């Protein structure tokens, strides 16, 4: 078997572990004229799984369209204010979670092949649909004397602009299968997070920064070809010449 010229369509599949960083969150406190930051806003890590279709243009340039799913990442936050009657200082504990679907158009530069290994860099642009579940918050007096009833704010979902930066290396497994190990950074814009309830909200997040460690594989159609049979050259037979 021989490897044909590195061009043609391919399919890809990837899984990854996502170190997610919420760049903060804001909400309207008591009035739509007063927007304040969450005092704490933390998002747990999650997993990603995805796939795509692409085209290897030549030995150095390829492009693909990918669709990925970010599994549930739990949110924990807190805010400070006043609650009860008469009003006393309170701290609110907030809980929610999100998932995200990301669609990207990507381009990569393969930096040459060294043995079986081809390092690359790349970038992508597209959008992410971020879906927040309901946000539940309970406000408790700082002196521990009481807690208000839980308030539930309806979660929001929307599409956000997203870009990606990638680096990694592929390893030739067979003539048409490449293993892929890499890093991807996703920048997801901010958007709506939860709605109004009980004199609080709506709220929005400031966006996500996602650092992914990824492994996957690419299957290149037509990457293998049978070496064609070439018969040995014929040796011309020359009749003897008699003088």
Regions found by a protein language model. Give the residues of each.
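Short glycine/proline- and aromatic-enriched beta-strand/turn motifs that initiate or cap beta-hairpins
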Residues: 1-50, 216-222
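Residue-level detector of the transmembrane beta-barrel scaffold of outer-membrane proteins
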Residues: 10-12, 62-64, 118-122, 178-180, ...
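Residues on the lipid-exposed face of transmembrane beta-strands in outer-membrane beta-barrel proteins
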Residues: 13-17, 51-55, 105-109, 123-127, ...
């Amino acid at each position: 078997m021989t490897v044909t010229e590195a061009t043609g369509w391919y399919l890809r599949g990837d899984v990854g572990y996502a170190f997610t960083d919420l760049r903060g969150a804001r909400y309207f406190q008591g009035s739509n004229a007063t927007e304040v930051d969450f005092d704490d806003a933390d998002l747990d890590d999650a997993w990603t799984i995805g796939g795509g279709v692409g085209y290897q243009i030549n030995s150095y340039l390829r492009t693909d369209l990918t669709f990925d799913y970010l599994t549930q990442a739990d949110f924990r936050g807190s805010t400070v204010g006043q609650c009860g009657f008469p009003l006393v200082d309170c701290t609110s504990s907030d809980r929610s979670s999100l998932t995200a679907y990301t669609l990207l158009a990507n381009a990569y530069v393969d930096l040459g092949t060294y043995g079986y290994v081809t390092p690359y860099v790349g970038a992508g642009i597209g959008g992410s649909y971020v879906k927040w579940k309901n946000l539940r918050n309970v406000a408790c007096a700082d002196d521990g004397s009481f807690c208000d009833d839980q308030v539930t704010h309806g979660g929001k979902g929307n599409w956000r602009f997203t870009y990606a930066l990638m680096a990694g290396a592929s390893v030739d497994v067979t003539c048409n299968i490449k293993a892929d190990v890499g890093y991807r950074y996703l920048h997801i814009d901010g958007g709506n997070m939860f709605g109004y309830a009980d004199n609080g909200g709506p709220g929005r997040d400031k966006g996500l920064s996602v650092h992914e460690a990824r492994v996957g594989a690419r299957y290149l159609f037509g990457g293998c070809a049978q070496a064609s049979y070439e018969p040995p050259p014929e040796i011309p037979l020359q009749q003897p010449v008699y003088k």
